[in-house]
Design a protein with these regions (language model features):
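Tryptophan-paired
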Residues: 47-103
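Edge beta-strands of extracellular beta-sandwich domains
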Residues: 106-113
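Compositionally biased low-complexity segments at domain edges in trafficked proteins
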Residues: 122-193, 197-232
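Short, surface-exposed binding/anchoring microloops in extracellular/periplasmic proteins
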Residues: 21-53, 60
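Bacterial N-terminal signal peptides
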Residues: 6-15
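Positively charged n-region of N-terminal signal peptides that target proteins for export
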Residues: 1-4
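Short, surface-exposed linear segments at secondary-structure transitions and domain or protein termini
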Residues: 65-71, 116-127
């Protein structure tokens, strides 16, 4: 009888180990989207884990506009806002986000596989000037020409530099049924954007597509390195 109990206990422990190995790792995290010199709208966000949808939101916010001074001075940096709460949502391994670029007058789709160790990266804490911070803000940036970067940023923006997780050229969406009925420009009032910024962009041309890669790399290289004291 005792031998049977030991065998049963060992079998249960094995099942628990297997279950733990496959379980989703949970961490406090959030997401956001933005641009480095453009007006944009985020229109859909979906996160996946092991092939299943864990978060989906058909809609989102738009930013106010691109700063005149930054366009003239060629000052490029990622900015934007946060998304909806992700409380209780496991850390995803894949993301799909749809954004409208006012400069390009296009709707783009970004599809990206996220690092396998993303939960661990998000959980790592750092001492920064006597305070604790961690990189658990997943940020999606879209630049003119469809260039995108996926970054891992500090929760309170204290820990730097931002970590580049992925980059590439987003795919222009041509399969949206409503876009075929009403143009993207009409849906989002892009004509007003053109009136306000059209001449400015002609006078001060900006990079396009992968031309952004070295520019944004240089921006990150200038960020202070405040991740020197990880919390063990």
């Amino acid at each position: 009888m005792l031998k049977y109990l030991f065998l049963l206990f060992g079998f249960c422990m094995s099942l628990m180990a297997c279950s733990t190995g496959n379980a989703a790792i949970r961490a406090n995290w959030s997401y956001g989207s933005g641009s480095n010199i453009d007006s944009f709208c985020t229109t859909k966000v979906t996160f996946y884990l092991h092939g299943k949808t864990v978060f989906s939101y058909p809609g989102g916010g738009c930013n106010a506009g691109a700063p005149y001074k930054d366009i003239i001075e060629k000052k490029y940096y990622w900015s934007g806002g946060g998304g909806l709460p992700t409380d209780g949502v496991p850390v995803p391994d894949k993301a799909e986000i749809e954004m409208v670029s006012f400069h390009d007058r296009k709707r783009y789709r970004i599809k990206v596989d996220l690092p396998a160790d993303l939960p661990q990266q998000m959980q790592q804490q750092y001492q920064v000037r006597g305070k604790i911070d961690q990189r658990n803000w997943l940020y999606f940036g879209l630049a003119p020409g469809g260039y995108y970067e996926v970054l891992l940023k500090g929760d309170k923006l204290r820990v730097k530099p931002d970590l580049l997780l992925a980059r590439g050229i987003a795919k222009e969406m041509t399969d949206d049924w409503y876009d075929k009925k009403v143009s993207v420009a009409e849906q989002y009032g892009i004509e007003d954007f053109d009136k306000e910024y059209g001449e400015l962009f002609k006078q001060h041309p900006i990079p396009r597509g992968m031309e952004w890669a070295p520019i944004m790399d240089a921006y990150r290289a200038r960020q202070p390195k405040t991740d020197q004291y990880p919390v063990q």
